[in-house]
């Protein structure tokens, strides 16, 4: 299994700590630097708990921003009838960073739930910085960007939300590859800034009807 990991198609490995958040304590290394034995030594020496292959994202997302895997965040909420409601969708966009988290200085933009099109400019968590209509490095338009495989992404997330009814509200991190969407993780304590800043308004009323 370790050798298979070292031979993954991207040629890269992602090391993480188990309790990491916001892109902190993440390191990306070339798989060619390791053997099955040395990878364990490296993790123990540097206090890493997890290692996974670096995922190759969809070419359109690489064109938008090649420095990191640019994930989609979708917020789901189970209502009183155990039906899945979408609270919001965001495209995270890296800016010369190996991670895409807003807390690490990157961008996030609102996505239309129905079409999968980015419908507003991207913003930073630092509200003193200007919003971005185009990517500041690649100059690719952000507003109007079509997230690939959108209908498949929404269907996948809704199905997953129903599998975890004990967690009523989850912030899903989705990677879009050339073969379709896949899960990175689901967050029970999802970031309210990522939810509200791209919308440019408070969204508390969406939670109040669920008594949250």
Q: Which positions does each model-derived feature cover?
A:
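Short, solvent-exposed loop/turn segments at secondary-structure junctions
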Residues: 19-22, 56-57, 81, 91-94, ...
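Well-ordered beta-strand positions
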Residues: 75, 175-176
């Amino acid at each position: 299994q370790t050798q298979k990991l070292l031979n993954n198609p991207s040629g890269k490995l992602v090391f993480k700590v188990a309790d990491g958040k916001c892109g902190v304590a993440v390191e990306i290394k070339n798989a060619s630097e390791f053997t099955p034995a040395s990878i364990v030594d490296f993790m123990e020496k540097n206090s890493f708990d997890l290692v996974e292959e670096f995922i190759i994202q969809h070419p359109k997302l690489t064109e938008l921003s090649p420095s990191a895997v640019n994930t989609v965040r979708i917020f789901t909420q189970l209502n009183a009838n155990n039906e899945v409601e979408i609270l919001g969708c965001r495209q995270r966009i890296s800016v010369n960073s190996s991670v895409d988290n807003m807390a690490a200085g990157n961008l996030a933009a609102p996505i239309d739930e129905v079409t999968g099109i980015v419908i507003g400019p991207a913003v930073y968590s630092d509200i003193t910085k200007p919003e971005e209509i185009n990517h500041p490095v690649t100059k690719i338009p952000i507003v109007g960007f079509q997230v690939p495989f959108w209908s498949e992404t929404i269907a996948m997330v809704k199905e997953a939300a129903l599998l975890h009814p004990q967690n009523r509200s989850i912030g899903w991190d989705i990677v879009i590859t050339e073969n379709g969407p896949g899960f990175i993780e689901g967050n029970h304590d999802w970031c309210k800034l990522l939810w509200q800043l791209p919308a440019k308004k408070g969204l508390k009323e969406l939670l109040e009807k669920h008594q949250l």
